[in-house]
C-alpha cells in the first residue's frame, strides 16, 4: 500500500488548536457522513450539511480527491452559460473541526466516498484518529426499509465492540451486502484498537430517493446519544 499520509493535507494552525485542546484529556469524537453507495433519504448528507451550516467549523484535513475518485463513474456537474463553462462543482472530501452548541470540539469527515484506494483511505483516517487522540468514531447513513412514514424511525446500530451498542436492539441476523468505505473503516479501526460505532437509519423505501430530513434528525439524535455532543437538532426539526 502507498503511503496513506500522501493523500491528505493537514492545516497546521487548526491542528495545533485541536492538539492544544486535547492536551491532558480526551481528544475529539470523529463523526463521519460521506456520500456513497447507500444513503436513503440523504440521511448522512443532510446531517453533514446541517452541522457545517449551523455550527462553527474550521477545515482541518483536505483529501486529494484526484487520487480517490473515478470521475467517469460519478461526473461532477458544470454549467454551460451561453458561450462558456462556469461553476464547476468541485468534489471534496475533508475533515472539519466543529464546535457543538456548548463549544465542545469534534471532527466531521464529510464529502464524497472514495471510489478507489479504500485501504489507503482507511489507513489515512486511522492516522488522523491516532494523531488527534480520537476516542470514538461515529458514522451515519440511511437505508431503505419496508416501513411506513407514519411510524417513528428506527435504526440499525453496529460497532466494532458489542459493549458500545449494548442498549440497542438488533434487527437483523447475518446478511451479506455490498460494502462501502465506512464499513471498511469501522472494521480497520477495530482491528487497530479504536472504538467505532455507526447508525443506519431505516427510511421508508418510497422516500429513499428524496431528501428526508426526519432521517437526518434521527441520525443526529443517535450521534448525540453515543457521543454526548449537542448538535442543534432542533434547528433541523424547524427547517
What are these model-derived regions, one by one?
Residues 104, 112-163, 185:
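Internal, conserved structured core segments that host functional sites
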Residues 40-44, 48, 114, 118, ...:
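Generic structural signal for well-ordered, non-membrane alpha-helical segments
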Residues 1-111:
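N-terminal short beta-loop-beta anion/metal-coordinating cradle
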Residues 61, 107-109, 138, 195-200:
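Hydrophobic/aromatic beta-strand patches that form the interior of the parallel beta-sheet core
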Residues 34-38, 108-118, 168-176, 206-210:
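Flexible, glycine/proline-enriched loop segments at strand-loop-helix junctions
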Residues 60-62, 229-239:
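Flexible, glycine/charged-enriched surface loops at secondary-structure junctions
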Residues 146-226, 230:
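Catalytic cores of processing enzymes, dominated by hydrolases/peptidases
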Amino acid at each position: 500500500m502507498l503511503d496513506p499520509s500522501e493523500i491528505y493535507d493537514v492545516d497546521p494552525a487548526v491542528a495545533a488548536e485541536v492538539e492544544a485542546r486535547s492536551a491532558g484529556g480526551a481528544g475529539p469524537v470523529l463523526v463521519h457522513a460521506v456520500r456513497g453507495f447507500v444513503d436513503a433519504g440523504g440521511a448522512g448528507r443532510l446531517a453533514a450539511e446541517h452541522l457545517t451550516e449551523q455550527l462553527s467549523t474550521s477545515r482541518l484535513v483536505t483529501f486529494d480527491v484526484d487520487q480517490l475518485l473515478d470521475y467517469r463513474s460519478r461526473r461532477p456537474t458544470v454549467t454551460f452559460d451561453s458561450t462558456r463553462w462556469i461553476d464547476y462543482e468541485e468534489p471534496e472530501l475533508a475533515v472539519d473541526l466543529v464546535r457543538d452548541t456548548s463549544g465542545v470540539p469534534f471532527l466531521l469527515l464529510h464529502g464524497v466516498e472514495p471510489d478507489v484506494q479504500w485501504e489507503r483511505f482507511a489507513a489515512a483516517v486511522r492516522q488522523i484518529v491516532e494523531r488527534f487522540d480520537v476516542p470514538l468514531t461515529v458514522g451515519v447513513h440511511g437505508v431503505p426499509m419496508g416501513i411506513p412514514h407514519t411510524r417513528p424511525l428506527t435504526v440499525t446500530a453496529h460497532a466494532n465492540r458489542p459493549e458500545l451498542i449494548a442498549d440497542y436492539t438488533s434487527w437483523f441476523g447475518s446478511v451479506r451486502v455490498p460494502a462501502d468505505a465506512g464499513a471498511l473503516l469501522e472494521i480497520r479501526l477495530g482491528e487497530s484498537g479504536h472504538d467505532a460505532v455507526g447508525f443506519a437509519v431505516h427510511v421508508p423505501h418510497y422516500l429513499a430517493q428524496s431528501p428526508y430530513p426526519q432521517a437526518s434528525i434521527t441520525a443526529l439524535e443517535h450521534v448525540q446519544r453515543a457521543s454526548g455532543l449537542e448538535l442543534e437538532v432542533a434547528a433541523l426539526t424547524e427547517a
